[in-house]
Design a protein with these regions (language model features):
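Perimembrane loop-to-helix junctions flanking transmembrane segments
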Residues: 42-62
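Membrane-proximal helix-loop-helix units in multi-pass membrane proteins
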Residues: 95-141, 151
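Juxtamembrane boundary at the C-terminal end of a transmembrane helix
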Residues: 46, 174-186
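Alpha-helical transmembrane segments of multi-pass membrane proteins
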Residues: 26-43
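Alpha-helical transmembrane segments of polytopic membrane proteins
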Residues: 58-77, 107, 120-135, 166
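Hydrophobic alpha-helical transmembrane segments
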Residues: 14-17, 45-47, 66-80, 102-120
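Cytoplasmic membrane-interface segments at the C-terminal ends of transmembrane helices
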Residues: 4-17, 76-98, 132-165
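Transmembrane alpha-helical segments of multi-pass membrane proteins
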Residues: 22-26, 90-112, 159-172
């Protein structure tokens, strides 16, 4: 004797698998954007390759990956957020926003203060980028607090508590793969 579950109670692995894939792709793209920007900042902040004119500063290896990384990351965050909603996981747009602007702001700040003189333009950009990242980082911290210390005891198997460490682990794996692949492609 078998009992069929209603369609609404059947669990599919497609939604969670899509969220996992999106977190990994987002992490790789974030890493590529971080290192590509850093490479360009190391040659003065601007470069060019190809075209009818000869550039005074050719682009370093891997600099072009930023043109792929940011659009792919944005689309992946949107698709991943839609999938995350369907499985009760946190959205990916807020972490993407916070980590993108936070990491690029870090590059500006570090480049502004590591030379012989302070580069005020980069310092201002770094502060602005960090201020743009701040609301998302605060939202992430509030979400982590709620996931770790929920106000009410959640029912077993509901909510997104287990996604918090999963996102952190997947982000770390994506970062490592992104760093390795950036070095290989540069």
């Amino acid at each position: 004797m078998s009992v069929d579950l209603p369609v609404a109670q059947r669990r599919s692995f497609r939604g969670p698998a899509l969220v996992v894939a999106c977190v990994l792709v987002m992490s790789v793209c974030l890493t590529w954007a971080f290192f590509a920007m850093r490479a360009v900042m190391n040659v003065g902040g601007s470069c060019a390759d190809g075209g009818p004119y000869v550039s005074a500063q050719p682009c370093p290896g891997g600099a072009g990956l930023i043109a792929i990384a940011i659009p792919v990351m944005i689309v992946t965050a949107m698709v991943g957020s839609a999938a995350a909603i369907s499985v009760g996981a946190p959205n990916l747009l807020i972490p993407m926003w916070g980590f993108l602007f936070g990491s690029l702001g870090w590059n500006f700040l570090e480049s502004a203060v590591t030379g012989p003189d302070i580069v005020w333009g980069w310092l201002v950009c770094g502060v602005v980028f960090e201020l743009m990242a701040l609301p998302a980082i605060l939202a992430i911290l509030a979400g982590v607090k709620t996931a770790v210390l929920p106000p009410d005891r959640p029912a077993p198997g509901t909510g997104s508590r287990w996604w918090v460490p999963a996102y952190a682990l997947l982000g770390a794996v994506g970062f490592l793969f992104g760093a390795w692949s950036f070095a290989a492609l540069s």
